[in-house]
Amino acid sequence: DCRYMFGDCEKDEDCCKHLGCKRKMKYCAWDFTFT
C-alpha cells in the first residue's frame, strides 16, 4: 500500500502517485506532477 498525503515515509516510493517523500520531515507531500 502507498502512503497518502502527510503519511509516514522513508523514500519517494513509499508514497502514492503524485506524492514524494519529504526526507527531513518524513512525510509524503505533493511532488507537483499531474500525470
Swiss-Prot record:
The family database entries (InterPro entries) matched by this protein are listed as: Huwentoxin-1
- Could you cite one Gene Ontology molecular function of this protein? ion channel inhibitor activity
Enumerate the UniProt keywords alphabetically.
Disulfide bond, Ion channel impairing toxin, Knottin, Neurotoxin, Pharmaceutical, Secreted, Toxin, Voltage-gated sodium channel impairing toxin
Organ and tissue specificity: Expressed by the venom gland.
The set of disulfide-linked cysteines is 2-16, 9-21, 15-28
What is the protein's major site of localization?
A: secreted
Where in or outside the cell it occurs: the entry states:
Secreted
Q: What is the protein's applied use?
A: Can be used to study Cav3.3 calcium channels, since it is a unique isoform-selective modulator of T-type calcium channels.
Family named by the database record: Belongs to the neurotoxin 10 (Hwtx-1) family. 28 (Jztx-11) subfamily.
The entry's other comment says: Negative results: shows weak effect on hNav1.8/SCN10A (IC(50)=50 uM), and no effect on rKv2.1/KCNB1 (tested up to 300 nM), alpha-7/SCN9A nAChR, alpha-3/SCN3A nAChR (up to 10 uM). Shows no activity on hCav2.3. Shows no or very weak effect on Cav3.1 and Cav3.2 calcium channels and on Kv1.7 potassium channel.
Give the protein's biological function.
Gating-modifier toxin that targets both voltage-gated sodium and calcium channels, with described activities on hNav1.1/SCN1A, hNav1.2/SCN2A, hNav1.3/SCN3A, hNav1.4/SCN4A, hNav1.5/SCN5A, hNav1.6/SCN8A, h/m/r Nav1.7/SCN9A, hNav1.9/SCN11A, hCav1.2/CACNA1C, hCav1.3/CACNA1D, hCav2.1/CACNA1A and hCav2.2/CACNA1B channels. According to Deuis and colleagues, shows a preferential activity on Nav1.7/SCN9A (Nav1.7/SCN9A (IC(50)=0.9-4.4 nM)). Another study shows a much less potent activity on Nav1.7/SCN9A (IC(50)=1457 nM).
Reproduce the free-text note on domains from the UniProt record: The presence of a 'disulfide through disulfide knot' structurally defines this protein as a knottin.
The protein's name in its UniProt record: Mu-theraphotoxin-Pn3a
Q: Which organism is it from?
A: Pamphobeteus nigricolor
